Amino acid sequence: MLAVGPAMDGELPPHEAPPAGSVLYSPPPLQTPLCGPSVQDTMLHYPWWNSFSPTTYPAFSSESHQFMNSSFIMGQPCTDPSYGPAATAPSFPPKSSDFPQDSSYLDDLSNASIFSSSVDSLSDIADTPDFPPADSLSQVPTIWDVSTGPSAHDKLFPPSGTFTGLEDPVSSLSSTPLLISYQAQSQPEEDDEAEEDEAEELGHAETYADYVPSKSKIGRQHPDRVVETSTLSSVPPPDITYTLALPSSDSGALSALQLEAITYACQQHEVLLPSGQRAGFLIGDGAGVGKGRTVAGVILENYLRGRKKALWFSVSNDLKYDAERDLRDIAAPGIAVHALSKIKYGDNTTSEGVLFATYSALIGESQAGGQHRTRIRQILEWCGEAFDGVIVFDECHKAKNASSTKMGKAVLDLQNKLPLARVVYASATGASEPRNMIYMSRLGIWGEGTPFRTFEEFLHAIEKRGVGAMEIVAMDMKVSGMYIARQLSFSGVTFRIEEIPLTPAFERIYNRAALLWAEALGVFQQAADWIGLESRKSLWGQFWSAHQRFFKYLCVAAKVHRLVELAQEELAQDKCVVIGLQSTGEARTREVLGEKEGQLDGFVSAAEGVFLSLIQKHFPSTKRRRERGAGSKRKRRPRGRGAKAPRLVYEAAGVIRISDDSSTESDGGLDSDFHSSPESLLDDDVVIVDAIGLPADDRGPLCPPQRDLHGPGVLERVERLKQDLLAKVQALGRELPVNTLDELIDQLGGPECVAEMTGRKGRVVSRPDGTVAFESRAEQGLSIDHVNLREKERFMSGEKLVAIISEASSSGVSLQADRRVQNQRRRVHMTLELPWSADRAIQQFGRTHRSNQVSAPEYIFLISELAGERRFASIVAKRLESLGALTHGDRRATESRDLSKYNFENKYGARALSCVLTTILSQTESKVPLPQGYPGGDAAFFRDMKQGLLSVGIGGRESRSGCLDVEKDCSISKFLNRILGLEVHKQNALFQYFSDTFDHLIAADKREGKYDMGILDLAPGIDEIYEESQQVFLAPGHPQDGQVVFYKISVDRGLKWEEAYARSLELTGTHDGFYLSYKVRGNKPSCLLAQQNRGKLFTVYKPNIGRQSQLESLDSLSRRFRRVTAEEAREPWESSYTFSLTHCSHTTWNRHCRLVQEGKDCAQGLRLRHHYMLCGALLRVWGRIAAVMADVTSSSYLQIVRLKTKDKKKQVGIKIPEVCVRRVLQELQLMDADVKRKQARTRGLLAPPSTPRPLALPFGPGEVLDLTYSPPAQAFPAPSPFTFPALGPGPGGQLLGAPDTPDAPADPVALLHQGCEINFKEVLEDMLRSLNAAPPAEPPGPLGPLGAGAAGAPAGGAPERQSVIQFSPPFPNS
């Protein structure tokens, strides 16, 4: 293994001049000798060494090839300052004051948890701008499996017999930031004072790093600042081997960013996957970066290469004009764009150009002329069998759920039938969940020749680990050359959540509506019982869908008044307003128009329309049953048989459908679902609930006797129930709010002042005489399709200063403050309805934040204080979190920290829900206190919550124990949807209890070290981070093996006096400043610097640990410390700073430490901390490392961390707890030995040569056998230093940690991996003789790579030697 000398040791501070002969500058001793002293002496003084100049360690520059293909292996010495002495530069920038710098997770090795972190240290931490620009990627070690040859891109995850993939169980916890309230706790004055110093040195630093192409040097700079997630920027892209045919131009039509994406896409298209299909490329650039021009550039590049046909799929036919514009902008006017929708079926006369089509066109069919024709067959015929042109899937997230939709299957089918096509996926959102990646079959992540045989295997492995694993996949995709993801910087963009209180009048209306819906549930059940309705799945599906939509309209209506106020405030400040909506309510407006023959007496209430439509169309009746029976293909069961009574009892409850709790595309969805087959609803989706809040078994039979089903009074009674309910809804409707969109336009000045870009064809407007009327949105000379484009022009020109956009119009519309338009006011983007999915959210947010803008927009999210409405924010937070990982490689990329506190749809949410329902319905004891101040106390809370849950269909049958069973499948989305139907005070109390339980569970997992926050930053805000050593191990793979690198990292967290004094000069608080402790320990008082926060708590800085994570109260400070001047504090501060580099706190106070006296390590209060990281091809070793972790710590959870060293190198990898280091290294050595053994077999070394001779020059990883592995001094804990297992009395050492072999193996290659006596002198003599006489069969290569090189010239003068000796088996004298 390659071992790099320490850049930093625990003996001296890195920024002080070391005395001569210090440990820092001396070669590290061999921890475990591989041969006896006499042999070492002979070997190290052999004159052969003098004939070669010493070489240094490789620089790992991103411009170089992969490490194993670098100049180091090729025999060329390479000088690298990166691993030289770390103490030569005394200049250190001051640390950020906003980050915790303490760590204790390496202290207690007996703790079973991997990462015992305090609550404080994992809270949200402010972003810092201290990451370098992305062009500093030249300093990033290329530790991934990247090669410049084409074969390097054949597969993303090469398979191996020994690679277990991600199939081992690893606890996957979704990342949900905990809401933290700091509370000062009085600390014991004795030994416990040390404990407050220590906290986990992990946290979230910045999310983005500035992006500049690191290896592509062509093109002009992009006009706007572009960023990449810090996680993705931590790994380099592959070297460029493809040369563009595009003509060079200085026009800037294609920026450097876009040319880089074109280059990598075309380079990836040169690769064939193991399945024989051509590899595809994913452009994950964010909205506004210019994906359209990039795609046009790929098409033009292939056109110039002779591939004259291309397919371009998008979401709307209108975007054909954008495609033509993009091709025109990059000077490709000769490429024609043909709209498939304008071409007749069977017409393939167009010979070349771009065939533009929508995804829905893929499933188009025609029966004209008696022939069955399909669009996909027409496309295939146009392309031809050997088609190798470009297929662009633009906005490819629209093809999500490919396995379950006809459209998605067509997308997959097209890719399979054109295996040589050059596929480009382009989307700002990619897919919002891993399961939506199924259509990206050309990425080569799953399938033949990969670790995952099917997409389902990949999905299971990734979802089991949550978003963190997806971040690793994104990095691996980038480094493999199949993915690129940049987006416009969000600097200058402000996010704000406006939580709106409800007025008493609105709350009264809401409570009346909730009670009426509870009554309606009972009425629907009673009517269904009376008429003997058999299958009720469709009925209850419609009921709960309408229930959800009704309360959604109410939630939105509660915010209209506040939104109008905010909009007018912003307009008064010379800004313009963009308002985002998800639905328009047009369907209900048209229904009312039909009922009243086109005459309206006021604005229409969409909420009332939903309720009335449900009753009129779906109320149980015999007429409805007859219609259903006639229209259904299913057999109708005979009704009224006694055997069916239990079925009726069972189905008398409300039914929850999975699809009911997700977005409905339009208001018409309520009607369109009625005739869908109810077989799609499984029986386990049923929730048993009693109509009047009583246990079902107490009500007697739910259906009347059989004779009553046909009695003369039954139908009349059912009809009377319906009419009574209709009357009550109409009475309520007179108080319900009107259509949100119409009211907004009216209050903001009418259609003359508001540019409406929605999908509706008409609207209700106020007339000057006070009446209202319905009018078409179409204008003279314009079709309805072009009205939105005209409205956009009016907004961009400044004619109108308010724009309202809906989901239907949000794709592809640019509304930013463009430099090229007249209206350059700052955009304020307000969201009335948080979109149902991240797909829609990103599309809407990207409308106002794009390239070439004068100013960045402001985003305002309006959320009412209704607890149930947080359901909508919950969806967005979850979707955006996942989206960040999938599209940009970092889950925090698109996650607003304000929104994250509403994210409940994860593992903790499910556990919290189970606890809440069990506690309320089954009256079990809970550790979480109930909400305080509920009217009537705890007893009333349980009674009201139980009744409320039953009234919204959540509950179960009464069991024999007398307690209600918790519904097994009640998910978070169902729960949050249903509690919308509770009175306001009830839903708020219930939601508060749920939130408290949620927080309690997260806090418990944080205490146990099981909480996953995704990729965390190691020691954020600390600059003194160094690589002390690294060891390279081979990892199995196909077609080539990868490698992982084991790093030892040193972190100096101390705060120098100069920095502390400079910080103190900026303090202004009455109690801010330096403090000395009353208690003197070790003849010296403790010293600290206190800075008051906004509240009454103080942030504390100490000389040995920097910023302390535990906040202190003034009372706590005053009790133990006295305030002093800077002059008084200087000497104790400097003394503590120097002493704590090598001595723990116990030694400082007591002059000795019990652990040290026992020969153990004690890191309490030390400035210097050591961490261990495993970087590289992590997916290939994930299962192995997780198994080791589980064995040592009882938890297989792997924490991914990233860091930036003092010399600006960035690393991302698995953090290895110190207690696991020994076992992990042993596992890696065994894996490395297995790979080398496999490589030896493939090279045909099974037949030994007749005479010993050197091996040929190694050209790949694994052909180097390191016989003199020299780990750095004190690389591992002193109590049990890692050593290679001893072999016995002889001087030989066991290589690579392979197990002892009692008998000599028959396989000569195995000799490489068993212990044996080696006469190094004879080995060297044989190798030197062979230099002059090469065997005829195979000429020897030069011996340049024999020296791994020194890490620099130590102070002692002699270079540290690393020898890599190569020979063929059998060993001499073995």
Swiss-Prot record:
One of its GO terms (cellular component) is nucleus. Residues 1-25, 182-207, 620-644, 1280-1303, 1332-1374 are annotated as: Disordered. It holds the Pfam family Helicase_C_4. The keyword Methyltransferase does not apply. Residues 188-200 have a biased composition (Acidic residues). Coiled coil: none annotated. One of its GO terms (biological process) is osteoclast fusion. It comes from the Eukaryota. One of its GO terms (molecular function) is histone binding. Residues 1351-1360 have a biased composition (Low complexity). The keyword Transcription applies. Keywords: Activator, Differentiation, Osteogenesis, Repressor, Transcription, Transcription regulation. Belongs to the SBNO family. Seems to have transcriptional repression activity in macrophages. Interacts with TAL1; this interaction inhibits TAL1 occupancy of the DCSTAMP promoter, leading to the activation of the DCSTAMP promoter by the transcription factor MITF. This is Protein strawberry notch homolog 2. It comes from Bos taurus (Bovine). The gene is SBNO2.
